[in-house]
């Protein structure tokens, strides 16, 4: 609701979390990308070799990693644009958020949240495999949990965007 959004905005503004937290989030996101990018195939030769080996191996985790790389690039560009847009239009308010959604930003946020959902779900899966939380016996159970997480985040996002799309400004 607009009241809840405005209450959250007032909290973020009065505690300076919007002004301080926004740049920190952006820096953490860029640092995460830089650390992860060390392993990414950037040159056409590296990408072609990766693609050839992925097709040869038929290994799901390899393809998931490629999807995670692609979503990372999408998130880096789109989330940076989102954070910069928020920081350049302070103070935050429900009216401004609704105006953005009603002004045609829905496709932008649908792509951003789809990329985020995939990236988070694949990342959690890969961390679980790396640290031995996921194994052959419980993999399907955890895949179900990841699916529930993705569906839950998608529904929360759609509900939020619907409330902004129908809000009078």
Model-predicted regions and their roles:
Residues 1-169:
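Membrane-embedded alpha-helical bundles that constitute the cytochrome b-like, heme-associated redox core
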């Amino acid at each position: 609701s607009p009241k809840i959004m405005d209450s959250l905005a007032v909290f973020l503004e009065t505690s300076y979390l919007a002004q301080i937290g926004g740049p920190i989030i952006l820096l953490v996101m860029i640092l995460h990308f830089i650390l992860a990018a060390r392993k990414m195939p950037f040159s056409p030769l590296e990408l072609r070799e990766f693609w050839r080996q992925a097709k040869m191996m038929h290994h799901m985790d390899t393809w998931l990693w490629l999807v995670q790389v692609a979503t990372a690039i999408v998130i880096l560009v789109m989330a940076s644009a989102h954070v910069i847009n928020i920081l350049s239009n302070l103070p935050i308010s429900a009216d401004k958020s609704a105006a953005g959604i009603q002004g045609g930003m829905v496709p932008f946020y649908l792509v951003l949240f789809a990329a985020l959902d995939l990236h988070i779900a694949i990342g959690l899966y890969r961390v679980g495999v790396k640290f031995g939380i996921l194994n052959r016996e419980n993999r399907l159970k955890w895949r179900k949990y990841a699916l529930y997480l993705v569906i839950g985040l998608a529904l929360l996002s759609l509900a939020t965007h619907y409330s902004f799309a129908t809000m009078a400004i």
